[in-house]
Amino acid sequence: LHACHNRTVVIDAHLGERENKQLPVVETHGLRNIHLYEGEDWVHIRDAVGDLADKFLCLNDVYPKGFLIPKRFIGENIIHLPTIKTHVFTTTTGAMKNAFGGLLNERRHWTHPVIHETLVDLLLIQRKIHRGVFAVMDGTFAGDGPGPRCMTPHIKNVILASSDQVAI
């Protein structure tokens, strides 16, 4: 089990893991802490999923030359740890939106005009490359409004979990 962080245009991942109190959890449990864009190998999507790429609804149009995904994820079990919040493009976030951040690089914003089709393509990719996928959603606080950055927080004190990435 290891913790993985992507690169984002919103906040530095190193700052985020400190401010969100993720580092103490990683350290307490002796997990390897991996920043996917620092020394990790990435592979071309066609090398990872083969002919499945021909079935993508939109990613081939958005990325005509293809795109790279983290090699580390191939054959791995994945546990997504999303939070409950709204999103201006997808209505809500969750495990599927987590895959968006984990499988696509920082140019992923080019998929926003076709975000729902992108999430379907990412589900296909996850089913192909991961041995298992599970999500535990933190609903201690839930975000409402024009998220993910400008939300009104609400205390909800719930935790949701499922192997169904669409449901969670």
Regions found by a protein language model. Give the residues of each.
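Extended, low-polarity segments enriched in aliphatic/aromatic residues
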Residues: L1-I168
